[in-house]
């Protein structure tokens, strides 16, 4: 029997400090630029202040990109434009600096950490720090079999928690969370459809490397078949992840929840992270207060998940590539919001703040 009790997260996760947020709002009202004139940057600064329990808000100085990687056997059905089992090649390209997330991370001077959970490649071909948390090689074909055994699901969830603890202990003050997977959006679509009670066609998108109509129909059919297997286990989130999630998505869910426990804010990237966040919300309803939706990728599953969590993405650029690239685009906005909240001068007490002519 599993010793992991997900119900504990309900008690362990607190909301960002509401009193501090009110103090941040009061400070904002005294600044020389009228409240509301900075749009969502005002909200971002106040959210970050509450997450840090600090007024004025501290600058984000140690952000990090964390990418969980895995291959999904469902890709053998032709649901992805990439060959099944090829996520390891993407990981190597990320590490060598040739993927969009690598370019953006260099531009923004943000380190990138890749965590192999279930790549279908020899772990000896990867750096030890990448492969150290691997649970298995590849994942089960979710339309006909479980993605993970119960033991593997617990190990993956605990690995995600451990990575969150490692980041918090190392001083990371904000995480951009993403995935590197082939077939991952099919698993994500299944989770979203199951948790939102909707049909497969509503959540089936084209993926990071767009697929044609025939592949879309195969993907929709795979999600439909996986949904039949997911619905009986909706009451047990760890079993749901074992049934149709996979090691990378299970680890991301554990990472998100433990980051909320450790009070480390997380920027969500695309549909895969949104699906994991939706599972996390089912586990602990306060957890999403620690997460920020970076962008609208145009993937219908992401839109459905964010709507269910009442999260509004910061950007709409149609970035579907995944791998944390869209999440990184939102990081400068968060950093700008923190700088504005902390550095704009305040007026003297009682002095009215007015718009410039």
Swiss-Prot record:
Catalyzes the synthesis of alpha-ribazole-5'-phosphate from nicotinate mononucleotide (NAMN) and 5,6-dimethylbenzimidazole (DMB). The keyword Transferase applies. It catalyses: 5,6-dimethylbenzimidazole + nicotinate beta-D-ribonucleotide = alpha-ribazole 5'-phosphate + nicotinate + H(+). Its EC number is 2.4.2.21. Keywords: Cobalamin biosynthesis, Glycosyltransferase, Transferase. Pathway: Nucleoside biosynthesis; alpha-ribazole biosynthesis; alpha-ribazole from 5,6-dimethylbenzimidazole: step 1/2. Belongs to the CobT family. PANTHER family: NICOTINATE-NUCLEOTIDE--DIMETHYLBENZIMIDAZOLE PHOSPHORIBOSYLTRANSFERASE (PTHR43463:SF1). One of its GO terms (molecular function) is nicotinate-nucleotide-dimethylbenzimidazole phosphoribosyltransferase activity. The active site is at 323 (proton acceptor). InterPro entries: Nict_dMeBzImd_PRibTrfase (IPR003200), Nict_dMeBzImd_PRibTrfase_bact (IPR017846), Nict_dMeBzImd_PRibTrfase_N (IPR023195), Nict_dMeBzImd_PRibTrfase_sf (IPR036087). This is Nicotinate-nucleotide--dimethylbenzimidazole phosphoribosyltransferase. The gene is cobT. GO terms for biological process: cobalamin biosynthetic process. NCBIfam families: cobT_DBIPRT, PRK00105.1. The keyword Membrane does not apply.
């Amino acid at each position: 029997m599993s010793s992991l009790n997900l119900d504990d997260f309900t008690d362990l996760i607190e909301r960002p400090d509401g009193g501090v947020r009110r103090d941040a709002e009061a400070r904002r009202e005294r600044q020389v630029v009228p409240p509301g004139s900075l749009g969502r940057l005002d909200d971002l600064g106040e959210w970050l202040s509450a997450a840090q329990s600090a007024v004025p808000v501290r600058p984000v100085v140690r952000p990090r990109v964390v990418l969980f990687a895995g291959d999904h056997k469902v890709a053998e059905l032709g649901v992805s434009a990439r060959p099944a089992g090829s996520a390891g090649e993407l990981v190597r390209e990320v590490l060598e600096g040739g993927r969009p997330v690598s370019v953006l991370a260099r531009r923004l001077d943000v380190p990138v950490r890749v965590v192999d959970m279930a790549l279908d490649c020899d772990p000896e071909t990867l750096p030890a720090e990448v492969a150290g948390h691997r649970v298995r090689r590849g994942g089960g074909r979710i339309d006909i079999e479980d993605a993970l055994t119960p033991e593997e699901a617990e190990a993956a969830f605990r690995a995600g928690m451990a990575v969150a603890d490692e980041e918090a202990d190392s001083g990371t003050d904000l995480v951009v969370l993403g995935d590197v997977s082939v077939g991952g959006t099919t698993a994500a679509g299944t989770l979203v459809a199951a948790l939102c009670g909707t049909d497969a066609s509503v959540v089936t998108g084209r993926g990071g490397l767009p697929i044609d109509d025939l592949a879309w129909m195969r993907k929709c059919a795979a999600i439909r078949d996986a949904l039949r297997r997911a619905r009986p286990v909706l009451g047990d989130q760890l079993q749901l992840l074992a049934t149709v999630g996979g090691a990378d998505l299970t680890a991301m869910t554990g990472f998100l929840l433990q980051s909320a426990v450790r009070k480390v804010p997380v920027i969500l990237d695309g549909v895969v992270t949104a699906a994991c966040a939706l599972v996390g919300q089912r586990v602990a309803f306060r957890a999403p207060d620690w997460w920020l939706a970076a962008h609208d990728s145009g993937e219908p599953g992401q839109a459905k998940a964010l709507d269910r969590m009442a999260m509004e993405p910061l950007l709409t650029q149609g970035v579907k590539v995944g791998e944390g690239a869209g999440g990184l685009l939102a990081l400068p906005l968060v950093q700008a919001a923190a700088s504005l909240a902390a550095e704009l001068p305040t007026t003297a007490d009682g002095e009215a703040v007015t718009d410039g002519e």
